[in-house]
Amino acid sequence: MPAPTIYVDADACPVKAEVEKVAERLGVVVTYVSNGGLRPSRDPMIRNVVVSKGADAADDWIVENAKSNDVVVTADIPLAARAVALGAHVLGPTGRPFTPETIGMAVAMRDLKQHLRETGESKGYNASFAPQDRSRFLGELDRILRRALKSATPG
């Protein structure tokens, strides 16, 4: 199995610096996928992919390129579900892992919240990103990447 790549749904991702920190320490390639606005990096281990402005263009690109054992970082639940189906390790920016066991409930909760917003039952409040989210993300990404690297090592 080849070494994992980290694919980041980069539009509005609050943990890019944390992704780079862990990836650099473990020697893993990072691919940021966005509709635009990415800063170029001099680091040869970081790739930027700019896709068209379509609603799911970045999501589609990630799903078309990610493979089993790669890592996908996203807050987008439908993308997380598609990546889990590929066999990728999926992590939200708050450090929440999405797995085959947890993705169904995440999709159901997303759909319920969307329905409540559409019917006016909810104002669409999302909790703000907190320092403990950043810390949890760092620890979880390190754990997931080490497991993916171990799976990629023959023997």
UniProtKB/Swiss-Prot annotation:
It comes from the Bacteria. It holds the Pfam family DUF188. Transmembrane segments: none annotated. InterPro entries: UPF0178. Belongs to the UPF0178 family. This is UPF0178 protein mlr0875. It comes from Mesorhizobium japonicum (strain LMG 29417 / CECT 9101 / MAFF 303099) (Mesorhizobium loti (strain MAFF 303099)).
